[in-house]
């Protein structure tokens, strides 16, 4: 059932005595926490995502945290019981994006190529959020010189690539392809 949902945050704590919840966001779209409507909730150990109504929400400035109110959560004890739960939004309700903006689900599994040589570097397997987004790229087996420097096994070596225009000049969703122009040493020093 997860294929119908996008993870948008994790409930980290109760807020006050009225059943409000603090949610650490992994979404770039505030409306997912502020606009009333159906969301999904899933326990900390995974399992089924069940639907729940978001009644309201507000941002805590500068913290990447939102305070939300869910239907049926009326007091601090009920809110505390939801600590660690994941909050999900329906994939069909994706906000509109500007040019050169992408949903994480569109980037994962795209093949990554060197912009100048055309050599396949790997596949995007994850995205991390920092000062800017970072692509986790599972490296191709033929990149032995890079992988030798990796603390991981050969089959698991990943490079972390900043998702900025200067380093990622091309994203072609139709061709399922990303091209990168890494400065010298970027792939070697950013192994995970």
UniProtKB/Swiss-Prot annotation:
<dbReference type="InterPro" id="IPR011961">
    <property type="entry name" value="RimM"/>
</dbReference>
<keyword id="KW-0143">Chaperone</keyword>
<keyword id="KW-0963">Cytoplasm</keyword>
<dbReference type="InterPro" id="IPR009000">
    <property type="entry name" value="Transl_B-barrel_sf"/>
</dbReference>
<dbReference type="Pfam" id="PF01782">
    <property type="entry name" value="RimM"/>
</dbReference>
<dbReference type="InterPro" id="IPR036976">
    <property type="entry name" value="RimM_N_sf"/>
</dbReference>
<keyword id="KW-0690">Ribosome biogenesis</keyword>
<comment type="similarity">
    <text>Belongs to the RimM family.</text>
</comment>
<protein>
    <recommendedName>
        <fullName>Ribosome maturation factor RimM</fullName>
    </recommendedName>
</protein>
<feature type="domain" description="PRC barrel">
    <location>
        <begin position="99"/>
        <end position="186"/>
    </location>
</feature>
<dbReference type="GO" id="GO:0005840">
    <property type="term" value="C:ribosome"/>
</dbReference>
<dbReference type="GO" id="GO:0005737">
    <property type="term" value="C:cytoplasm"/>
</dbReference>
<dbReference type="InterPro" id="IPR002676">
    <property type="entry name" value="RimM_N"/>
</dbReference>
<dbReference type="InterPro" id="IPR011033">
    <property type="entry name" value="PRC_barrel-like_sf"/>
</dbReference>
<dbReference type="Pfam" id="PF24986">
    <property type="entry name" value="PRC_RimM"/>
</dbReference>
<dbReference type="GO" id="GO:0042274">
    <property type="term" value="P:ribosomal small subunit biogenesis"/>
</dbReference>
<dbReference type="InterPro" id="IPR056792">
    <property type="entry name" value="PRC_RimM"/>
</dbReference>
<keyword id="KW-0698">rRNA processing</keyword>
<dbReference type="GO" id="GO:0043022">
    <property type="term" value="F:ribosome binding"/>
</dbReference>
<comment type="function">
    <text>An accessory protein needed during the final step in the assembly of 30S ribosomal subunit, possibly for assembly of the head region. Essential for efficient processing of 16S rRNA. May be needed both before and after RbfA during the maturation of 16S rRNA. It has affinity for free ribosomal 30S subunits but not for 70S ribosomes.</text>
</comment>
<dbReference type="GO" id="GO:0006364">
    <property type="term" value="P:rRNA processing"/>
</dbReference>
<comment type="subunit">
    <text>Binds ribosomal protein uS19.</text>
</comment>
């Amino acid at each position: 059932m997860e294929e119908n949902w996008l993870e948008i945050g994790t409930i980290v704590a109760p807020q006050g005595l009225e059943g409000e919840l603090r949610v650490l966001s992994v979404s770039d779209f505030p409306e997912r926490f502020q606009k009333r409507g159906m969301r999904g909730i899933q326990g900390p150990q995974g399992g089924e995502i069940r639907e729940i109504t978001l009644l309201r929400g507000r941002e805590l400035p500068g913290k990447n945290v939102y305070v939300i109110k869910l239907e049926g959560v009326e007091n601090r004890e009920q809110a505390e019981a939801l600590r660690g739960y994941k909050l999900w939004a329906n994939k069909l309700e994706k906000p509109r994006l500007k040019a050169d903006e992408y949903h994480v689900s569109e980037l994962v599994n795209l093949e990554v190529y060197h912009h100048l040589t055309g050599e396949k570097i790997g596949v995007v397997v994850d995205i991390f959020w920092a000062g800017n987004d970072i692509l986790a790229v599972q490296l191709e087996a033929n990149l032995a010189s890079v992988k030798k420097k990796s603390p991981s096994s050969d089959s698991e070596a990943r490079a972390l690539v900043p998702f900025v225009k200067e380093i990622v000049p091309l994203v072609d969703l139709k061709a399922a392809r990303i091209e990168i122009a890494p400065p010298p040493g970027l792939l070697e020093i950013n192994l995970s």
